[in-house]
């Protein structure tokens, strides 16, 4: 199973293609750090606008780097919460558009739960002994 994963919860626009939940075929990140540093922190409106500018190109590059065409994907995963609402809306709406255009299923992903699940990318058994607070 191959998924396109889209992340836009704060100040980085990211897209990756992941195979079988473990193998990263691509991972493209557009950072906004240089833009926000002059303000001393992330400015939500600027972050949202920069996501809107970057998301299409980041996604195109992730698909190209993976060698997997859009029509060969099995689904689209997207961060829906928590995060900056405007930034999240850019990613969610872009993913929804792709889902509607292609007929691919859309999988909403909770950002904090994905940090926990990231253990499955590096540990064969999922790092069965890790703690988290629910």
Which residues make up each language-model segment?
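Short acidic/glycine-rich loops and adjacent helix/strand connectors
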Residues: 1-134
